[in-house]
């Protein structure tokens, strides 16, 4: 379980697996870079293992039953839980960190990947290792949709999908935030036979659905 944070702020978008690993912008990104180095070194040392590193972009969503999902204790650190807690009144307002980035609406751009699609990528990766189908001892795949969505676009999409008007405010930039990043998932599409299929609209709607999906 790696992360797109290993790329830092990519020079080219969408970012591919061949993009250089730049200095991490956050402690979290640094830990992912260190973890990747440890895995590569372990395999290179002759250990009898192979590895697949899945570089997640921004996971969101819940299982369709609504029985398994993201329900953090305390103040959420991720956008979607904070957004949903604001929608149902747990939080007074949502803070958008910065509207002066070099993006169409000034807010950060991310690649939001549904957690169910992400879980399916894990199953495929594990089977690839067990069935000895790897082409290299260490393989890396971007797990994203290939679609960049800004924070303000996500808020607007949530409001449209749910009919809930969100109370949000623009505040200053947050240290460690990447301006914009989204995946080129072509390698995972081709090699793993995997592709993100869940839409952002359906993902947002599930958060406030009164009953689980079948």
Sequence positions of predicted segments:
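Alpha-helical substrate-binding/gating segment
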Residues: 61-62, 84-102, 110-139
């Amino acid at each position: 379980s790696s992360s797109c944070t290993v790329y830092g702020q990519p020079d080219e978008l969408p970012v591919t697996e061949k993009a250089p690993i730049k200095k991490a912008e956050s402690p979290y990104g640094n830990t992912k870079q260190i973890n990747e180095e440890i895995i590569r070194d372990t395999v290179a040392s002759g250990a009898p293992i192979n590895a697949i590193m899945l570089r997640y972009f921004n996971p969101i969503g819940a299982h369709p039953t609504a029985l398994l999902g993201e329900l953090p204790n305390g103040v959420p650190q991720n956008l979607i839980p904070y957004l949903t807690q604001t929608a149902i009144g747990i939080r007074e307002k949502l803070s958008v960190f910065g509207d002066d980035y070099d993006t169409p609406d000034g807010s950060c751009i991310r690649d939001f990947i549904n957690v169910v699609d992400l879980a399916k990528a894990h199953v495929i990766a594990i089977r690839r290792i067990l069935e000895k189908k790897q082409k290299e001892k260490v393989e890396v795949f971007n797990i994203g949709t290939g679609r960049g969505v800004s924070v303000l676009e996500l808020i607007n999409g949530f409001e449209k999908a749910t009919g809930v008007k969100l109370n949000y405010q623009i505040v200053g930039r947050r240290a460690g935030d990447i301006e914009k990043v989204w995946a080129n998932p072509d390698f995972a599409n081709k090699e793993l036979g995997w592709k993100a299929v869940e839409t952002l609209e359906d993902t947002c709607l599930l958060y406030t659905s009164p009953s689980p999906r079948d």
